[in-house]
């Protein structure tokens, strides 16, 4: 209930304070978090790109009640909620570079939500960004611009929220 929301403590398994060095990368992540900006990180393997991206949700503002409800509903629709109750931490989605178009934007007969919707309210991290299929990268245009994704099916159109911070990484 809303009383529980006001008293909740959000805890993450990771902490942005764990990142040592990488001052420019940390500054980029702080700017991304403060302004809800998307970001591209380029650097050698083992340079800390994934570590910083995984910790980005921990420096984003706490979720509002409405965000918690919305993220919980999204996870419930695809069976990820289980008995967790209300989701209180921002999502972090890290799809593999072999992810299909349907898994990224959603699809199927029932218009199932994809990674861009599962990342709603949090972070979508695309490591090895140049390895993703061109059509997957192109399909990100709509959610990045409108913060929603539309899936057209013969039964009708499904419009899902897709308000996330996109972090791309490459070597």
Language-model features and meaning:
Residues 112-145, 171:
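Conserved AAA+/SF3 P-loop NTPase catalytic/coupling segment centered on the Walker-B
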Residues 78-99:
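Conserved P-loop NTPase mechanochemical-coupling segment
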Residues 1-40, 47, 152:
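Peripheral, non-AAA+ core regions of ATP-driven protein-machinery
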Residues 13, 17, 59, 107, ...:
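Long C-terminal interaction/binding lobes of large macromolecular proteins
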Residues 93-118:
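Short glycine-rich substrate-engagement loop in P-loop NTPases that contacts/grips substrate
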């Amino acid at each position: 209930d809303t009383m529980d929301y006001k008293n909740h403590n959000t805890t993450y398994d990771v902490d942005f304070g764990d990142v040592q060095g990488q001052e420019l990368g940390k500054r980029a992540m702080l700017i991304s978090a403060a302004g809800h900006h998307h970001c591209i990180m380029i650097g050698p393997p083992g340079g800390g790109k994934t570590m910083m991206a995984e910790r980005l949700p921990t420096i984003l503002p706490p979720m509002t009640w409405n965000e918690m409800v919305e993220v919980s509903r999204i996870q419930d629709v695809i069976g990820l909620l289980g008995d967790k109750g209300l989701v209180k931490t921002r999502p972090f989605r890290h799809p593999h570079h072999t992810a299909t178009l349907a898994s990224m934007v959603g699809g199927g007969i029932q218009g199932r939500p994809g990674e861009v919707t599962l990342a709603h309210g949090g972070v979508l991290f695309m490591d090895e960004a140049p390895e993703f299929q061109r059509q997957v990268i192109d399909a990100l245009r709509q959610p990045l611009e409108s913060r929603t994704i539309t899936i057209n099916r013969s039964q009708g159109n499904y419009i899902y929220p897709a308000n996330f911070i996109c972090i791309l990484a490459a070597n």
